[in-house]
Amino acid sequence: MNPVSAVRQWVADLPITRKFILLCTLLTLGIIVLAVCAARMQYLGLVDGRKQQVKTQVEMGMDVIGRYAGMARRGELDEAQAKRQAIAMLASLKTNGDVDYFFITDPSMRVVMHPKRATGSYMGDYKSDAGEYVYRQITAAAQRGDGFSHYTAPKPGEKNQLPKIVYSSLYKDWGWILTMGVYADDIQREAWGFTRD
């Protein structure tokens, strides 16, 4: 007798109450599988949304740099003034209660502007607590052109390392890599919340 026939015979021989329990168990397992799949789809959608958000913010920041570079090209400002004004503008643009901010490095991983790092600091050897070379990832992503990298970092004033989605773009004329990251710690919570609603 083949396995399918054996299962059919086993089910046929069960008392009606056990058949009902088996049916309810299978339905419950099916609902759980659907909920997990829905949560995963929701999670992936939220990640894509967050990636688009940070990419759009960096693109807007690149427009700011481009505007000041254009002023320098037209002679309205000298290049040093244009860079200072671009830095001041980008430093003032923060989101999510000042948690998400722009920073600028150069391709040699030296800080041009960062709210928590000294200008000129070499960051190529900087590692997150998880052992990730953060600035190497950022520089490689910007030079590849896709711009995305992921690492862990604490939120300002906290110690816990949280997942971060980061987008970087290289402004070649000035040799600047503009970067912004958003924390992704709430994405999984939102996705599971979707299944409870």
Segments the model singles out, each with a brief description of its role:
Residues 80-87, 117-156:
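Extracytoplasmic/periplasmic sensor domains and loops in membrane signaling proteins
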Residues 135, 158-169:
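A short beta-strand signature within small-molecule sensing/ligand-binding domains used
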Residues 185-197:
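Membrane-interface helix-start motif
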Residues 171-180:
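Short hydrophobic/glycine-rich mini-motifs in sensory/regulatory modules
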Residues 91-111, 146-148:
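Short N-terminal helix-loop-first-beta-strand/juxtamembrane motif that initiates sensory/input modules
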Residues 2-41:
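Extreme N-terminal signal-anchor transmembrane helix of membrane signaling/transducer proteins, especially
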